[in-house]
Amino acid sequence: MKRFLFLLLTISLLVMVQIQTGLSGQNDTSQTSSPSASSNISGGIFLFFVANAIIHLFCFS
């Protein structure tokens, strides 16, 4: 049961990251001041860090 929950959590986090990157990539409008690419990268890195921390908490608990 613990492995099933771990697998479900991992898959849901991967789907969440894919949705987040898809939504941030679709904001291509004709604005004069667009956010830099590093802001999107930092958001992805933060999500990856949170997902990694949660996975390790479940794995080592």
From Swiss-Prot:
Pfam families recorded: CD52
Could you say which residues form the signal peptide? Answer: 1-24
Q: Which InterPro entries match?
A: CAMPATH-1 (IPR026643)
Q: Which UniProt keywords apply?
A: Cell membrane, Glycoprotein, GPI-anchor, Lipoprotein, Membrane, Signal
Question: Which BP terms does GO give this entry?
Answer: positive regulation of cytosolic calcium ion concentration; respiratory burst
Q: Where is the lipid attached (GPI-anchor amidated serine)?
A: S36
Q: Where in the cell is it found?
A: Cell membrane
Instruction: Give the chief site where it resides.
Output: membrane
Identify its membrane topology class.
Answer: Lipid-anchor; GPI-anchor
Top-rank taxon of the source lineage equals Eukaryota
- Name it: CAMPATH-1 antigen
Organism equals: Homo sapiens (Human)
> What's the source species' lineage?
Eukaryota, Metazoa, Chordata, Craniata, Vertebrata
